[in-house]
């Protein structure tokens, strides 16, 4: 019996989806540069070793497809959190505090731990490799609309940071969060955990507090608190 054009297209979409899922896992485990498209095809159980190139044109297209599949969910969640933060602040007749904006940035990523999968690990690999491959710098979650919007709001709440300093801290924030989440996710997935790994709620709150501290820390020696350990008297 001949297959219909609709059936062929559906099969093609299913194959492409399998390739994307396999690539996300392999890239999260080993890094984008270390994985070949042939390995992706094999992991997707495809006998066609060129299937990734056929559907996505190459590794860059495949990475973009992973982001296109995952980023909209994070984008919508972050937009919802921003709206809620704005509503709370409007009721108090004040701007959204910088602390709340930092949380809006990263809570959707933290929630990925509840969904399983490998996207946070994938983002951690992208963050680590972005300086070696120029096109990678445009592909992580920071390219989504809600991330840019919240980042712009946060920059205005932190006038003590010039543009360069703000971008540097934001990049450090992304690396800290996705790297820590990837390590936590791997530890939880192993079933054995890690030495000293506490409850998820404590982990989440500690990560949020660390993120807020990173973005809101004062700059320059004149702004250091002399009571802090390790600072000159």
Protein language model features and the residues they cover:
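Amphipathic alpha-helical packing segments from all-alpha helical-bundle domains
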Residues: 100, 118-121, 131-158, 167
């Amino acid at each position: 019996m001949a297959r219909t054009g609709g059936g062929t297209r559906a099969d093609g979409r299913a194959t492409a989806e399998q390739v994307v899922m396999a690539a996300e896992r392999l890239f999260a485990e080993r890094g984008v540069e270390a994985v070949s498209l042939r390995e992706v095809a094999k992991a997707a159980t495809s006998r066609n070793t060129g299937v990734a190139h056929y559907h996505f044109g190459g590794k860059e297209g495949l990475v973009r497809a992973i982001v296109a599949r995952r980023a909209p969910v994070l984008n919508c969640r972050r937009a919802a959190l921003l709206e809620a933060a704005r509503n709370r602040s409007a009721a108090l007749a004040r701007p959204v505090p910088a602390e709340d904006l930092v949380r809006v940035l990263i809570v959707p990523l933290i929630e990925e731990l509840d969904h399983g999968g490998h996207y946070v690990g994938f983002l951690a690999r992208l963050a680590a490799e972005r300086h070696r491959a120029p096109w990678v710098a445009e592909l992580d979650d920071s390219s989504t609309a809600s991330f840019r919007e919240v980042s712009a709001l946060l920059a205005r709440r932190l006038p003590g940071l010039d543009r360069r300093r703000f971008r540097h801290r934001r990049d450090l924030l992304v690396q800290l969060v996705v790297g820590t989440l990837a390590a936590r996710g791997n530890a939880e997935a192993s079933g054995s955990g890690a030495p000293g790994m506490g409850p998820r709620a404590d982990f989440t709150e500690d990560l949020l507090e660390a993120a807020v501290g990173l973005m809101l820390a004062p700059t320059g020696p004149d702004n250091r608190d002399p009571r802090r350990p390790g600072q000159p008297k």
